[in-house]
From Swiss-Prot:
NCBIfam families: PRK13298.1. A single active site specifically recognizes both ATP and CTP and is responsible for their addition. Keywords: ATP-binding, Magnesium, Metal-binding, Nucleotide-binding, Nucleotidyltransferase, RNA repair, RNA-binding, Transferase, tRNA processing. Its cofactor is Mg(2+). Pfam families: PolyA_pol, PolyA_pol_RNAbd. It catalyses: a tRNA precursor + 2 CTP + ATP = a tRNA with a 3' CCA end + 3 diphosphate; a tRNA with a 3' CCA end + 2 CTP + ATP = a tRNA with a 3' CCACCA end + 3 diphosphate. InterPro entries: CCA_bact, NT_sf, PolA_pol_head_dom, PolyA_RNA-bd, tRNA_CCA-adding_enzyme. Belongs to the tRNA nucleotidyltransferase/poly(A) polymerase family. Bacterial CCA-adding enzyme type 2 subfamily. Catalyzes the addition and repair of the essential 3'-terminal CCA sequence in tRNAs without using a nucleic acid template. Adds these three nucleotides in the order of C, C, and A to the tRNA nucleotide-73, using CTP and ATP as substrates and producing inorganic pyrophosphate. tRNA 3'-terminal CCA addition is required both for tRNA processing and repair. Also involved in tRNA surveillance by mediating tandem CCA addition to generate a CCACCA at the 3' terminus of unstable tRNAs. While stable tRNAs receive only 3'-terminal CCA, unstable tRNAs are marked with CCACCA and rapidly degraded. This is CCA-adding enzyme. Its EC number is 2.7.7.72. ATP binds at G8, R11, R91, R137, R140.
Length: 414
């Protein structure tokens, strides 16, 4: 029985990246042998075991044969006569199909080390097309490694297009799709993930709402789309904010905000909350079971998009109402996130009409002015029940209005 280090640990070590998890493949072993050595079996579809001390994953070498549809439609063979190369050939990419023995020697039958040196993301074999999940994985690896100069091999991109054309993507669960997307949003360049999905024609399947943005024919105001909302502007913006903010909810919300742009012909200066745009985001989040902390910021930012970008012209009453609607009194961090997003919105291109670059700063300043209005003083005055809420709202509006009048000459409220 021989044991080899495989997968991401070998790849990341060769790339001089931090090794997070170590996965091992066992050649010539059996379930019985590993159980006798106190390994704990955890795999359902195929034998995977946890080491009794390190708790690292050890999988029996296996072969796979396509027997159905989707990423689960495989029969596996985990017999002790399965070779290391037979195990490695079933893997998705050459850079993930390198093994290392106990002496540090590399076993690299598919030239993964060479592809690492050349910065190439390339499939191992033609069986790549049998697993639709690989479309998402390749897009994620492209986002993960682009800063190191990696690109997808042309022949691999062609196979991804074939997977899409064969409609294999329909067999992926929403959970699988979101898991890969969430990982991509954590990378240094999440915009690359969506660009790759667009290029292989998969974006419209996974995110039809987002694909809508790529087609100017869908827009009421096509000249507006051409100038401000083409895919390059959208993805460049995501790249820009990703340099400044690592929060997944902020990055995801940035993409979602563009779903409001087709409302541009409406009288947006009078919109308080765009329930239609917000409902689209809510539907996306429900479909993928996206965590509530991400959903909430995305829905709020999209719904209040036009209000936030005309906030200088809004009444103090409406601004206080905004803080209440976003639950800012209990969750002040939401104001910070919405302010950040407001400073990176597509409407900032209208510099002559809006003070958009400063809208986020203004929002935060407004909140700092009113957040400390004392409830204790209101209670001392004898207010009860609903009267308490009415009075604290009145005092907040009054305090904000006083500050705005006092600072009216400072147009940008710095």
């Amino acid at each position: 029985m021989k044991i080899y280090l495989v997968g991401g640990a070998v790849r990341d070590s060769l790339l001089n990246l931090p090794v997070k998890d170590k996965d091992w493949v066992v050649v010539g072993g059996t379930e019985k042998i590993l159980l006798e050595r106190n390994f704990q079996q955890v795999g359902k579809d195929f034998p995977v075991f946890l080491h009794p001390e390190t708790h690292e994953e050890y999988a029996l070498a296996r072969k796979e044969r396509k027997s159905g549809k989707g990423y689960t439609g495989f029969d596996t063979d985990c017999n002790s006569d399965v070779t290391l190369e037979e195990d490695l050939i079933r893997r998705d990419l050459t850079i993930n199909a390198i093994a290392q023995d106990e002496y540090g020697n590399y076993i690299d039958p598919f030239q993964g080390k060479k592809d690492i040196e050349c910065g190439l993301i390339r499939h191992v074999s033609e069986s790549f097309i049998e697993d639709p999940l690989r479309v998402l994985r390749v897009a994620r690896f492209a986002a993960t490694l682009v800063h190191l100069g990696f690109k997808i091999a042309e022949e691999t991109m062609l196979l991804m297009c074939i997977i899409v054309k064969k409609q294999e993507l329909s067999y992926l669960t929403s959970n699988r799709i979101w898991n890969e997307t969430e990982k991509a949003l954590k990378t240094l360049n999440p915009h690359v993930y969506f660009q790759v999905l667009y290029e292989c024609n998969a974006l419209h399947f996974f995110f039809p709402e987002m694909y809508f943005l790529y087609e100017k024919k869908n827009f009421l105001n096509r000249s507006f789309f051409k100038k401000f909302c083409n895919k390059n502007i959208i993805l460049m913006g995501l790249a820009e904010i990703s340099l400044l903010n690592k929060d997944i909810d902020v990055r995801f919300s940035y993409l979602c905000q563009f779903l409001s742009v087709n409302q541009i012909d409406r009288n947006y200066s009078k919109i308080f909350f765009d329930s239609y745009a917000a409902s689209i985001i809510h539907s996306v989040c429900k479909r993928f079971k996206i965590p509530s902390y991400i959903r909430d910021i995305a829905v709020l930012n999209t719904g209040f998009y036009f209000f936030l970008n005309t906030i200088h012209y809004q009444s103090s009453k409406n601004i206080i109402n905004l803080f209440s609607k976003v639950d800012a009194w209990r969750k002040p961090d939401r104001v910070k996130k919405l302010a950040f997003l407001s400073n990176f919105n597509f409407l900032r291109n209208f510099k002559s009409e809006f003070f958009c670059i400063k809208s986020g700063c203004f929002l935060e300043k407004c909140f700092s002015v009113v957040k400390n209005v004392s409830i204790k003083l209101i209670l001392k005055k004898g207010f009860k029940g609903y009267e308490i809420k009415q009075e604290i709202t009145r005092l907040r509006i009054k305090k904000l209005e006083f500050w705005r009048i006092k600072n009216i000459k400072h147009r940008f409220y710095l």
